[in-house]
Design a protein with these regions (language model features):
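Hydrophobic alpha-helical connector segments
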Residues: 2-36, 85-88
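Amphipathic, well-ordered alpha-helical segments in soluble domains
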Residues: 3, 36-40, 61-68, 98
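Amphipathic alpha-helical packing segments from all-alpha helical-bundle domains
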Residues: 21, 25, 43-74, 82, ...
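Amphipathic alpha-helical segments used for helix-helix packing
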Residues: 31-53, 99-104
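Alpha-helix N-cap/helix-initiation sites
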Residues: 37-38, 78-82
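Hydrophobic, amphipathic alpha-helical faces that serve as interaction scaffolds
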Residues: 40, 84-87, 93-97
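C-terminal peripheral helix-coil segments that are non-catalytic and often amphipathic
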Residues: 66-78, 91-130
Length: 130
């Protein structure tokens, strides 16, 4: 998942995308990975929440998303960009960890890839206000 070739392919696949489209693509890829590797991903996310470390998976995800959030909203100051990136990562983790409750509450099955994609796009619009 984290191989150099894989990230090079992502760069090539997203070449010409807008910053929002890149963020959407990366988010969908992240969510798909979490759901497709449920057990290990759940342990990883919960470990990051329980014992945060400077370079844990949540931090690395935040670092990867930060420049894309900034590119989507160049009008915002750095503090606002950092907050919005934090909101996005937190919501994505909750979408994953609490998918059953969220699915019941909102009436959408987040185990279904298309439903996840649509919900993720809505979350991006809500958080980024674009």
């Amino acid at each position: 998942f984290r191989s150099v070739e894989h990230f090079q392919n992502i760069r090539e696949e997203t070449d010409g995308f807008t910053p929002f489209e890149k963020l959407e693509y990366l988010g969908n890829m992240t969510l798909d990975f979490l759901f497709e590797h449920y057990a290990v991903s759940k342990i990883s996310v919960l470990t990051d929440m329980q014992s945060p470390k400077e370079n844990d998976n949540t931090y690395r995800t935040y670092a990867a998303y930060l420049p894309l959030v900034a590119a989507c909203r160049p009008d915002l100051d750095e503090a606002a960009i950092r907050r919005k990136t934090l909101y996005l990562i937190t919501v994505m983790q909750q979408m994953f960890l609490r998918y059953e409750v969220i699915s019941q509450t909102l009436g959408i099955d987040l185990r279904q890839k298309e439903n996840r994609r649509n919900f993720h796009i809505q979350v991006l619009h809500d958080i980024l206000e674009v």
